[in-house]
């Protein structure tokens, strides 16, 4: 079965295309092509791929950490209404048993599926941070990095744990990063007072980037570039919602690496 979706503007990896259509055959995009001359009907003003939201704590009045059976379904529907096709429910620093329970719920939802945006797995943000840039994370619940504990978290998640955020200056951080990467878990750096050197060492060990660049980390100084400086020299290391970081600062990030800034 073939059908066509026509849009005034259509987003592709090459940028926006005006007055183009998708030709879809058996659920697969078969062609991206100009709308024939004389066809005035448009199915959408703007047409683009669904987003993948890799860091979601909550929304629609609920939180990923809430111990209720319908929380993840509510969030999945909320994300779908925002144009998100898949997402990573993200935990926060909490007692270890509370984190385990959240990871178990996410794993079950990931495996059984359900309405709304697809759950791709879990994102562990905390408790492996340091107090100087703790943000909303309670420092009394921070923990040291131990390989056995990380393996337990992976097991509890039924191997659906996709990302772990940690502070790279913590004892054992580099070993933990290498181990997590061997387990196919991505590592982000944040809520940290790490130096430029410590951050670069973490990247060299396999860390994938910074979690909320500029926020929750050592700032940029002309004599000590800090985590922000390390991030600005590595294209993997930033993301922003333009609320916690000014647009001009975000433009600085983009100008380092993106042809579309």
Where are these regions (language model features)?
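Active-site core of metal-dependent hydrolases
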Residues: 151, 155-247
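Positively charged, low-complexity/disordered segments
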Residues: 246-261
């Amino acid at each position: 079965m073939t059908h066509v979706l026509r849009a005034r503007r259509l987003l592709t990896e090459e940028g926006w295309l005006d007055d183009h259509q998708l030709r879809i055959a058996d659920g697969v995009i078969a062609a991206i092509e100009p709308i024939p001359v004389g066809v005035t009907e448009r199915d959408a003003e703007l047409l683009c791929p669904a987003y993948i939201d890799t860091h979601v704590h909550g929304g629609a009045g609920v939180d990923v950490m809430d111990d209720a059976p319908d929380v993840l379904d509510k969030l999945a529907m909320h994300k779908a209404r925002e144009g998100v096709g898949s997402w990573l429910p993200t935990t926060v620093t909490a007692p270890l048993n509370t984190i385990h329970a959240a990871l178990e719920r996410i794993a079950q939802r990931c495996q059984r599926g359900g309405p709304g945006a697809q759950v791709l797995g879990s994102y562990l943000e905390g408790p492996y941070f340091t107090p100087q840039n703790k943000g909303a994370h309670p420092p009394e619940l921070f923990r040291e990095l131990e390989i056995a504990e990380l393996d337990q978290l992976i097991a509890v998640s039924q191997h659906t744990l996709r990302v772990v955020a940690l502070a790279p200056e913590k004892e054992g951080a580099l070993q933990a990063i290498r181990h997590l990467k061997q387990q196919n878990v991505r590592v982000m750096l944040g809520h940290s007072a790490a130096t430029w050197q410590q951050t670069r060492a973490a990247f060299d060990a396999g860390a994938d980037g910074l979690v909320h660049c500029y926020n929750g980390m050592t700032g940029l100084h002309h004599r000590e570039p800090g985590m922000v400086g390390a991030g600005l020299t590595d294209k993997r290391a930033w993301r922003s919602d333009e609320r916690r970081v000014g647009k001009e600062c975000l433009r600085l990030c983009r100008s380092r690496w993106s042809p579309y800034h």
